[in-house]
A protein has these predicted regions:
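N-terminal capping/lid subdomain adjacent to the active-site entrance of alpha/beta enzymes
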Residues: 1-144
Length: 144
């Protein structure tokens, strides 16, 4: 089995306030594992300044994972215990490798017919901006 990753810098459509500052970009890493003719893809996503595993050696740990991808999964998880976003991406990639192009969890959401009702994200801002987002989410059917 082989593994590699690619870093992407996503640009937010608008500056987005959090409890720890304003975000305009987001780094994410796409992990790809391959075995014979099959491949699996997973996302290792961190928010700088917010994520538990936002540490200087993040890419170094991704490189380590790629070099050690043939280790037992439990050994990989143990060595990655302080990098939950990398574990998540690795689990996604293994599921994708196992299931091929099939969706992980077929649903109304993955078919674009519905949304995840608990993920109505509200960005920090002044009271008027936050209130308008709340009203918009309620109008869209978010209720929790």
């Amino acid at each position: 089995m082989q593994a590699n990753f690619q870093k992407y810098n996503l640009q937010f459509k608008q500056a987005s306030g959090t409890s720890r500052g304003v975000l305009t970009t987001k780094e994410t890493y796409i992990l790809e594992i391959s075995k014979e003719e099959k491949k699996g893809i997973g996302e290792c996503a961190i928010f700088r300044g917010l994520s538990y595993d936002d540490v200087p050696e993040y890419e170094e740990k991704l490189n380590w994972l790629c070099q050690n991808i043939n280790q037992d999964f439990d050994i990989l998880k143990k060595d990655l215990k302080h990098f939950p976003s990398i574990i998540f991406g690795l689990e996604q990639a293994f599921l994708n490798l196992k299931n091929g192009s099939d969706l992980y969890f077929p649903s109304e959401f993955t078919e674009g017919k519905d949304f995840i009702k608990i993920n109505g994200l509200i960005w920090m801002g002044n009271a008027e901006f936050m209130q308008s987002q709340i009203e918009e989410k309620l109008d869209q059917g978010f209720d929790c």
